[in-house]
Structure formats: C-alpha cells, structure tokens
Amino acid sequence: MLTKKEQRLRRARQTRIRIAQQGVARLTVNRTNLHIYASVISGDGSKVLASASTAEADVRKSLGGSGKGGNAAAAQIIGKRIAEKAKAAGVEKVAFDRAGFAYHGRVKALADAAREAGLQF
C-alpha cells in the first residue's frame, strides 16, 4: 500500500505526462507549511518562463510584519504575480499542474487569482 506522499507523487507524475503530451506551458504549484511556490514552465519542459513565491523579499514585505506565507491570502498574491509575470513573458494559456495536491485551500486560491489576473487554463 502506498503512503499518502507516494500517492501524491504518483498523481503528480501522471499529470506531468499528460501535460507534456499537450505541449503547452504549465503552471506548477508547490506548497509547504511556510510558503507557496508557482512557476510557469515551457511546453517542452526545458525552461522556466516565470516564477513567484512567498519566499521573495517583495512578497514578504507585502504580507506585512507577520511574514505568513502559508495561507490563502498569500496564495492569492502569488497567483496574481505569476499571472502578471507569465503575461510579460508572452504566455497567456497554460495547463495547471497542481503536483498531486488537492484542488482546495491554498492551491485553489492561487488558481482562482491567476485566472482573475488573465491567465487561461
């Protein structure tokens, strides 16, 4: 029987394979207890086109003195930033790669904010 982490990694691997077959850029999300990270990777997987995380100094300042990067409000900020950076890099349409994480909470907040900022997926 697979552990919870092994199941998540298996789902993530299967998703990456399906997205690679489509050949479109992918928006990847990784979350930890303290931070959330997002990056837009080219269709062939060879280049990172844009990235944003709550570990960046600018984002930490905008979160205030608390520096809490592991909540839904921080995920919304990252969603807006990654959409702006992706559009600046010329990417408007992506496939959403949630890395096996459930589409709930911080992952959903990031995705919704990116959609509102104009990224299509």
Curated annotation (Swiss-Prot):
Task: List keywords of the entry alphabetically.
Answer: Ribonucleoprotein, Ribosomal protein, RNA-binding, rRNA-binding
* Annotated GO biological process: translation
Q: Name one GO cellular component term.
A: cytosolic large ribosomal subunit
Molecular function terms, GO-annotated: 5S rRNA binding; structural constituent of ribosome
User: SUPFAM superfamilies attached here?
Assistant: Translational machinery components
Summary of subunit composition and partner proteins: Part of the 50S ribosomal subunit; part of the 5S rRNA/L5/L18/L25 subcomplex. Contacts the 5S and 23S rRNAs.
Q: Which NCBIfam families match?
A: L18_bact
Function per UniProt: This is one of the proteins that bind and probably mediate the attachment of the 5S RNA into the large ribosomal subunit, where it forms part of the central protuberance.
* Similarity section: Belongs to the universal ribosomal protein uL18 family.
Which PANTHER family does the UniProt entry name for this protein? 39S RIBOSOMAL PROTEIN L18, MITOCHONDRIAL (PTHR12899), LARGE RIBOSOMAL SUBUNIT PROTEIN UL18M (PTHR12899:SF3)
Protein's name according to its UniProt entry = Large ribosomal subunit protein uL18
